[in-house]
Amino acid sequence: MKIDITSLNGDSAGSIDLDDSIFGLEPRQDLIARMVRYQLAKRRAGTHKTKGRAEIARTGKKLYKQKGTGSARHGSARVPQFRGGGRAFGPVVRSHAHDLPKKVRALALKHALSAKAQGGGIIVWSDASATDAKTKALKASFAKAGLLSALIIDGAEVEQNFALAARNIPQIDVLPVQGINVYDILRREKLVLTRAAIDALEARFK
């Protein structure tokens, strides 16, 4: 797949052939969905908690005698059926993370990249750099290029001025290539890759 390379200002800088084994697959939505579920589950805090009957601060004394009252027999007042009692099978503090094989994760990333390429959502830049760490100037450049919602992936390190200028722009995410992930690719309209990012991705999946 051939795609044009541009600069941040929109100037043409040639073209590049994208590897079909990474960017030219027929997207599998099931793999992408599994990966998104894996990512979202892993980032959950899991700090939910309710008190069970053993944790309620209330007497454990038998409410009234077993027989002769005409009422249902009861023991502790901490049981779930009473107001103020413990919650039965309530949430506990835990990790929601689950396993997903490494090969499935790698394949899901390829399919997410292919889906974005198939929809015309990939833009290739020669590099991602800024002369000054000025958000206003960079935001104007993005608006001129029509980038209102984008994930920008650079090489192993993001140029400092560019990272500082872009970090406060809404719906613009900037990551080094090792941070690329399926969820962030899908949640933004455009995926911007630098030449360095493409070289790193092709080396990673070779």
Curated annotation (Swiss-Prot):
Keyword Cell cycle appears in the UniProt entry: no
InterPro entries reported for this sequence: Ribosomal_uL4, Ribosomal_uL4-like, Ribosomal_uL4_dom_sf
One Gene Ontology molecular-function label: structural constituent of ribosome
One of the record's GO cellular component terms: ribosome
Domain of life: Bacteria
Keyword Ribonucleoprotein in annotation: yes
Record key words, sorted: Ribonucleoprotein, Ribosomal protein, RNA-binding, rRNA-binding
GO biological process assignments: translation
Function: One of the primary rRNA binding proteins, this protein initially binds near the 5'-end of the 23S rRNA. It is important during the early stages of 50S assembly. It makes multiple contacts with different domains of the 23S rRNA in the assembled 50S subunit and ribosome. Forms part of the polypeptide exit tunnel.
Family recorded in the similarity comment: Belongs to the universal ribosomal protein uL4 family.
Subunit relationships: Part of the 50S ribosomal subunit.
Protein name as it appears in the record: Large ribosomal subunit protein uL4
Lineage: Bacteria, Pseudomonadati, Pseudomonadota, Alphaproteobacteria, Hyphomicrobiales
